[in-house]
UniProtKB/Swiss-Prot annotation:
Protein's cellular compartments: Cell inner membrane
Binding site for Cu(2+): H284, H333, H334
Biological source species: Escherichia coli (strain K12)
Quaternary structure and interacting proteins, as annotated: The cytochrome bo(3) ubiquinol oxidase complex is a heterooctamer of two A chains, two B chains, two C chains and two D chains.
Keyword terms: Cell inner membrane, Cell membrane, Copper, Electron transport, Heme, Hydrogen ion transport, Ion transport, Iron, Membrane, Metal-binding, Respiratory chain, Translocase, Transmembrane, Transmembrane helix, Transport
Protein's UniProt name: Cytochrome bo(3) ubiquinol oxidase subunit 1
Annotated heme b binding sites: H106, W170, H421, R481, R482
Gene: cyoB
Periplasmic side: 1-16, 81-95, 162-184, 261-270, 327-340, 410-412, 478-489, 607-613
Length: 663
C-alpha cells in the first residue's frame, strides 16, 4: 500500500539529520503558532497565498529564496568543515554517503531554489512597473508558477527526513543516476523536484515574454525599455528555449529508472553522452538566465547612483542579445575531456571566448557610467562595484578554462569550483542583494538600514575571496572536487583558509538578517513618502511606495528612455490627473495552491512508488485545472472612489515631503 515507504526511511541513526529535522519542525510549529496567535490565517490566504498581484508574488519568491539560502549555505559550511578535517587526517563528521547527498543538494538548492526564485522574484516585482503595466499578461499562471516552485522546495526538504537525496552531483549524470547504481529514492527526489518546479519556470518564461512584448505603456518602444526589462526579456527567451530541454531530458531519465528503457545506458543502444549533451544544452543557457537579469539590476543601479544617464544604452542592449544567442553554442566546454575531438573542442573553445566580448562591453559601459558621475556610495552601489571586481576575476578564469588544453589540466578540479562560484556569487548573488536593497523601498515603503547593509557587503566580499581564492591554488595543485575522505595533508592549510572564508560569509548572511530585522523595527524612521527615494529614472519610481495593487491610476505615456526622469525634468512627475476611470483587474484565485498541493502528493507518491496516491494526486491536479478553466468570475473593476482615495493619500505624502509637480 505504501510502496517503498517504511519507517526505515527516516534516518534515526544520523544525529546531524535528526537535529536538523527537529529544528525545522520546531521552527515550523513556532511559525504556525504565531500566525494562529495573531489571527492572520484569513489575511494570509486572501492577501498573499491566493494573490495574483505580481508584486506580492515577487516578494514571496524572494522570501523562499532567502529561506533556502540558509539551507543551502548550511550545506556549504558542512562541506568546507568536512574537507578541512579530512585533510588533517581525521574522518570528519560526515560519512561519505551523507557528504555526497550534501554536495548534490547544495548545488540543486542554490541554483534552482535560491538563484532562480530570487531572480524571478525581482522580475515579478519590477518589470510590470517598469513598463507601465498593471499586472502580467497571465496573472493566474504567475500564481501557479510560484506554487510549482514551492512544490520543488518541499520535496527537496522532505528528502532530508524521509529517505535520502541523490548522491550524484547536481546534474545527476548517468550511469550513476541510473537504477543500477542508484537504486534508492534519492535520484527520484531529484527528478520530481526539478520536473515540477521546472514547469513553473517555463510558465514564468512564457508569461513575462508576452507581458514585455504586449503590455508596455503607450510610447514605450523596444529601445525605450529600461535595461533591466531588456535583460529580463532575453532571460525569458532563454527560459522558453532551454527549459523544455531539461524537461525532456529528465523525463527520459525517469523512463530509464521507472520503465527500464535504455536512453542513457551503454547497453541496449543507449548513450550516457547524449544525456550530458542535453543537460548542458539546458545548463549553460541557465547560467545566463540567472546572470542577464542581474546585469540589468547593475545597469539601473549604476545610472541611479552615478547621477547620470546610463552610458552606451544601445550597446548594452545588443550585448545582451548577443549573449542570449551565443549562450546556446558554448555548452560543450563543460566536457572538453570527454572525447569529442580537437576540432569540436576548438570550435566550442572559441565560441566561449567570444561570449566574453559582449560581457566585457557591459563592464566598460558600467565603468563609463560611473566615470565623472557624482557617485553615491550606497550599499546597492557597493554591491555593484564589488560585482565588477569579483565578476571580472571569474570571467578571466572562465576564458582560461575555455582553452581546451588548460581545461584538460583543470577539469573537475577545485579551480573549476572556484571559477563558477566566482561568477555565480560575484554575479548572481551580489546582484540579487543589490536589487533587493535598491527596490526594497518600492516593495515595502521604507528603506533598508545602511549600516548593517554595508557590514553585510564587506563580510560577503572579503569572505568570498578568502573562501575561494585558495581553491584556485588547490586546483593547480591537483585537488579534485567532491572529496570527503583521505584528502592529501598538503592541502590542509588552504582548506582551513577556505573554511574561515565560509565563516566570514556566514557573518555576512547574519548581517543581512539583522539588517532586515532592524529595518522593519525602525521602518517609521525610514519611510519613503515620495515613491522615489533614490532619485530614480524609470517608471517604477513614478508610483507610491509600496505601489497600489493597480500600479498606475493613469497609465503613463512614455516619450523618452528615462521616462520618469523626463517627467521630473518637465515638472510633470507629481501632477494630479484631471479625472480617474475604473480599472480592470484580475481576482485572486486559490486554484494555484490547490494544484500545487496535489502536485506535491503526486511527486511524493511517484518517488516512493505509491501508485494509488500518485493517481489521486494527478487526478486532483487535472480536475482542479478543469474546474478553474470553467470559472468565468476572474476579474472585476476597481471603482473610481477607491482609486481617488488611494491616490489622494499618495499626493498628501508627496506634499508632506515638500515636493510639488516634480520640482
Amino acid at each position: 500500500m505504501f510502496g517503498k515507504l517504511s519507517l526505515d526511511a527516516v534516518p534515526f541513526h544520523e544525529p546531524i539529520v535528526m537535529v536538523t529535522i527537529a529544528g525545522i519542525i520546531l521552527g515550523g510549529l513556532a511559525l504556525v503558532g504565531l500566525i494562529t496567535y495573531f489571527g492572520k490565517w484569513t489575511y494570509l490566504w486572501k492577501e498573499w497565498l491566493t494573490s495574483v498581484d505580481h508584486k506580492r508574488l515577487g516578494i514571496m519568491y524572494i522570501i523562499v529564496a532567502i529561506v533556502m539560502l540558509l539551507r543551502g549555505f548550511a550545506d556549504a559550511i558542512m562541506m568546507r568543515s568536512q574537507q578541512a578535517l579530512a585533510s588533517a587526517g581525521e574522518a570528519g563528521f560526515l560519512p561519505p554517503h551523507h557528504y555526497d547527498q550534501i554536495f548534490t543538494a547544495h548545488g540543486v538548492i542554490m541554483i534552482f531554489f535560491v538563484a532562480m526564485p530570487f531572480v524571478i522574484g525581482l522580475m515579478n516585482l519590477v518589470v510590470p512597473l517598469q513598463i507601465g503595466a498593471r499586472d502580467v499578461a497571465f496573472p493566474f499562471l504567475n500564481n501557479l508558477s510560484f506554487w510549482f516552485t514551492v512544490v520543488g522546495v518541499i520535496l527537496v526538504n522532505v528528502s532530508l527526513g524521509v529517505g535520502e537525496f541523490a548522491q550524484t552531483g547536481w546534474l545527476a549524470y548517468p550511469p550513476l543516476s541510473g537504477i543500477e547504481y542508484s537504486p534508492g529514492v534519492g535520484v527520484d527526489y531529484w527528478i520530481w523536484s526539478l520536473q515540477l518546479s521546472g514547469i513553473g519556470t517555463t510558465l514564468t518564461g512564457i508569461n513575462f515574454f508576452v507581458t514585455i512584448l504586449k503590455m508596455r505603456a503607450p510610447g514605450m518602444t523596444m529601445f525605450k525599455m529600461p535595461v533591466f526589462t531588456w535583460a529580463s526579456l532575453c532571460a525569458n527567451v532563454l527560459i522558453i528555449a532551454s527549459f523544455p530541454i531539461l524537461t525532456v531530458t529528465v523525463a527520459l531519465l525517469t523512463l530509464d529508472r521507472y520503465l527500464g528503457t535504455h536512453f542513457f545506458t551503454n547497453d541496449m543502444g543507449g548513450n550516457m553522452m547524449m544525456y550530458i549533451n542535453l543537460i548542458w544544452a539546458w545548463g549553460h543557457p541557465e547560467v545566463y538566465i540567472l546572470i542577464l537579469p542581474v546585469f540589468g539590476v547593475f545597469s539601473e543601479i549604476a545610472a541611479t547612483f552615478s547621477r547620470k544617464r546610463l552610458f552606451g544604452y544601445t550597446s548594452l542592449v545588443w550585448a545582451t542579445v548577443c549573449i542570449t544567442v551565443l549562450s546556446f553554442i558554448v555548452w560543450l566546454h563543460h566536457f572538453f575531456t570527454m572525447g569529442a575531438g580537437a576540432n569540436v573542442n576548438a570550435f566550442f573553445g572559441i565560441t566561449t571566448m567570444i561570449i566574453a566580448i559582449p560581457t566585457g562591453v557591459k563592464i566598460f559601459n558600467w565603468l563609463f557610467t560611473m566615470y565623472q558621475g557624482r557617485i553615491v556610495f550606497h550599499s546597492a552601489m557597493l554591491w555593484t562595484i564589488g560585482f565588477i571586481v569579483t565578476f571580472s576575476v571569474g570571467g578571466m578564469t572562465g576564458v582560461l578554462l575555455a582553452v581546451p588544453g588548460a581545461d584538460f589540466v583543470l577539469h573537475n578540479s577545485l579551480f573549476l569550483i572556484a571559477h563558477f562560484h566566482n561568477v555565480i556569487i560575484g554575479g548572481v548573488v551580489f546582484g540579487c542583494f543589490a536589487g533587493m536593497t535598491y527596490w526594497w523601498p518600492k516593495a515595502f515603503g521604507f528603506k533598508l538600514n545602511e549600516t548593517w547593509g554595508k557590514r553585510a557587503f564587506w563580510f560577503w566580499i572579503i569572505g568570498f575571496f578568502v573562501a575561494f581564492m585558495p581553491l584556485y591554488a588547490l586546483g593547480f595543485m591537483g585537488m579534485t572536487r567532491r572529496l570527503s575522505q583521505q584528502i592529501d595533508p598538503q592541502f590542509h592549510t588552504m582548506l582551513m583558509i577556505a573554511a574561515s572564508g565560509a565563516v566570514l560569509i556566514a557573518l555576512g548572511i547574519l548581517c543581512l538578517v539583522i539588517q532586515m530585522y532592524v529595518s522593519i523595527r525602525d521602518r517609521d524612521q525610514n519611510r519613503d513618502l515620495t515613491g522615489d527615494p533614490w532619485g530614480g529614472r524609470t517608471l517604477e519610481w513614478a508610483t507610491s511606495s509600496p505601489p497600489p495593487f493597480y500600479n498606475f491610476a493613469v497609465v503613463p505615456h512614455v516619450h523618452e528612455r528615462d521616462a520618469f526622469w523626463e517627467m521630473k525634468e518637465k515638472g510633470e512627475a507629481y501632477k494630479k490627473p484631471d479625472h480617474y476611470e475604473e480599472i480592470h483587474m484580475p481576482k485572486n484565485s486559490g486554484a494555484g495552491i490547490v494544484i500545487a498541493a496535489f502536485s506535491t502528493i503526486f511527486g511524493f507518491a511517484m518517488i516512493w512508488h505509491i501508485w494509488w496516491l500518485a493517481i489521486v494526486g494527478f487526478a486532483g491536479m487535472i480536475i482542479t485545472w478543469i474546474v478553474k478553466s470553467f470559472d468565468e468570475d476572474v476579474d472585476y473593476y476597481v471603482p473610481v472612489a477607491e482609486i481617488e482615495k488611494l491616490e489622494n493619500q499618495h499626493f498628501d505624502e508627496i506634499t508632506k515631503a515638500g515636493l510639488k509637480n516634480g520640482n
